[in-house]
């Protein structure tokens, strides 16, 4: 069926728990993770919408409220976006790198749509190629997706590239 929010009861409980823990330890700044529209589409495949774009748009609209609720509670928002790298070899292995970059750009566009009313200074994005035990020989190179990744409406972009497969990209 259509993508809809199931409400913010569980989210509010998570926010309340985090803020209580922060207060108990004197922390004045905290962040809460949330899934990006793209990562949701990676693990929950579209079974309703006519196109991937329509599915991503529906996910972005549904997640927008969650993102705004987190930031509205005084927390920073961390979006987990392994879809911008990991999905290259998980879901889109049949595409060329250039075709995948177009998919990643579509995911960034959906994410930015959901973030359009949030100050980028309150947002960080986590991008990775997956934390599975394996050689990572099918990972897309950072230089092929970097400019697309940097278009996210986030001041902070975190790249998890500490496995040996990506060492050459930082040295």
Go through each PLM region and give its residues.
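Domain-level signal for soluble alpha/beta catalytic cores
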Residues: 1-171
